[in-house]
C-alpha cells in the first residue's frame, strides 16, 4: 500500500503548485508538463500492477452527533477515499470514486443503506456523480474544467480508458468560503484551507469531521507537496487552521481517517522541517538531519527530491 500512498501524494500534490495567484507562478509551463507526465506514468505503472492482484475496497463507520460517517477506502491506484454521511432523512456522498470498480462497490453500498441520496459534494476530486447535481467550494467548478486540472483528467482518461467513469456533467452549486450548508440536519461549514493547496478548501462536517485534500499521515512529505520553502509555512498554517476547529477526526480525499494525534504529528513534522532548514546549509545535511529526527518514517526515498526543492 505504500506505493499507492506515494502515488496518491504525487497526484494530489500537482494542485499544491498550481493554486491561484502567487503559487501558480512557481512553475513554468514546461515544469507543469513534466509533472503531469510523471503523474500519468506513475498511474499507468500502478494500474498495471493492480491488474495482477487487485484489492477490493473496504468500508468503515464512525459516529458523529446524530449521524454516521461511512468511509470507503477504494484501495485503487489513487488511494482515494470517499464518504457517506447518513442520517434518518437520507444520505450525502462526498468525493465519490473515480474508477468503475470503485463506483460499483460504492453504489452497491449506498443501495444497501436504503435511503435517498439528497446531496453530493465534490471537494477536490471528480468522481462518479454522472449527471447528478453536485455541491462544490467556490471556484472549484471553473478550476476543474480548465488548464492543468482539465488536462490532467483528460490524460487519466486516455491512459486508464474504460476503467474510469465518464467525467461528471451535472450542474454545480458553489458554496462561498465561510458559509454553512445544512443538509439532513447536519452542518457543512466550507472554510479556507492551506494556501499551498487548491482551491484551499476544507469542510467541517457536523463539528466532528474535518475534510481536507489529504489526510495528515505519519509519513514524510514529498517534493510535489512542498514546492519551496514558502509551501512549508503555508502547509503548516493550513494544518493549524484545521486544528482550530477541534474536530474528532480529520479526513482526506486521499488517505481516509486520521486522529488529532496524527494531525499534531504532521504539525510537529513541518515545524521540524522549518527548524532544520535554518540549521542546515545544504540539502544533503538537511536530509540526514530529517532522517535522524524521524527514523524509519515511510517516504525516505523521496527526501532527496524534497530537499532539492527546499534548497534551490
Please report, for each region that a protein language model flagged, where it lies by residue.
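Short, Lys/Arg-enriched N-terminal segments with co-localized hydrophobic residues
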Residues: 4-35
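Sec-dependent signal peptide recognition
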Residues: 37-43
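Hydrophobic h-region of N-terminal signal peptides that target proteins for export
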Residues: 45-53
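Metallo-beta-lactamase
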Residues: 56-59, 63, 98, 147-268, 272
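Conserved beta-strand hairpin/beta-sheet module of binuclear metal-dependent hydrolase folds
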Residues: 58-112, 201-214
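Active-site metal-binding motif and surrounding structural segment of the metallo-beta-lactamase
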Residues: 89-90, 100-143, 246
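Accessory terminal helices/loops
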Residues: 244-249, 256-312
Amino acid at each position: 500500500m505504500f506505493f499507492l500512498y506515494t502515488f496518491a501524494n504525487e497526484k494530489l500534490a500537482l494542485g499544491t503548485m498550481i493554486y491561484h495567484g502567487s503559487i501558480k507562478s512557481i512553475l513554468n509551463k514546461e515544469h507543469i508538463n513534466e509533472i503531469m507526465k510523471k503523474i500519468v506514468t506513475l498511474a499507468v505503472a500502478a494500474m498495471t500492477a493492480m491488474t495482477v492482484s487487485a484489492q477490493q475496497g473496504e468500508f468503515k463507520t464512525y459516529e458523529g452527533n446524530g449521524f454516521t460517517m461511512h468511509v470507503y477506502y477504494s484501495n485503487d491506484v489513487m488511494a482515494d477515499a470517499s464518504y457517506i454521511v447518513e442520517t434518518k432523512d437520507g444520505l450525502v456522498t462526498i468525493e465519490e470514486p473515480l474508477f468503475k470498480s470503485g463506483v460499483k462497490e460504492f453504489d452497491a453500498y449506498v443501495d444497501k443503506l436504503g435511503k435517498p441520496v439528497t446531496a453530493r459534494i465534490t471537494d477536490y476530486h471528480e468522481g462518479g456523480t454522472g449527471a447528478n447535481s453536485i455541491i462544490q467550494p467556490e471556484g472549484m467548478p471553473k478550476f476543474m474544467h480548465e488548464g492543468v486540472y482539465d488536462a490532467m483528467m483528460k490524460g487519466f482518461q486516455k491512459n486508464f480508458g474504460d476503467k474510469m467513469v465518464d467525467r461528471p456533467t451535472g450542474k454545480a452549486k458553489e458554496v462561498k468560503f465561510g458559509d454553512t450548508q445544512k443538509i439532513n440536519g447536519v452542518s457543512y461549514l466550507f472554510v479556507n484551507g492551506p494556501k499551498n493547496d487548491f482551491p484551499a478548501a476544507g469542510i467541517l462536517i457536523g463539528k466532528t469531521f474535518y475534510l481536507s485534500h489529504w489526510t495528515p499521515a505519519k509519513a514524510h512529505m514529498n517534493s510535489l507537496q512542498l514546492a519551496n520553502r514558502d509551501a512549508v509555512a503555508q502547509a503548516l498554517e493550513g494544518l493549524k487552521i484545521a486544528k482550530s476547529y477541534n474536530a474528532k477526526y480529520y479526513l482526506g480525499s486521499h488517505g481516509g481517517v486520521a486522529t488529532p494525534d496524527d494531525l499534531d504529528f504532521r504539525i510537529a513534522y513541518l515545524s521540524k522541517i522549518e527548524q532544520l532548514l535554518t540549521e542546515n546549509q545544504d540539502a544533503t545535511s538537511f536530509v540526514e538531519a530529517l532522517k535522524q529526527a524521524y527514523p524509519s518514517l515511510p517516504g525516505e526515498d523521496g527526501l532527496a527530491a524534497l530537499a532539492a526543492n527546499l534548497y534551490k
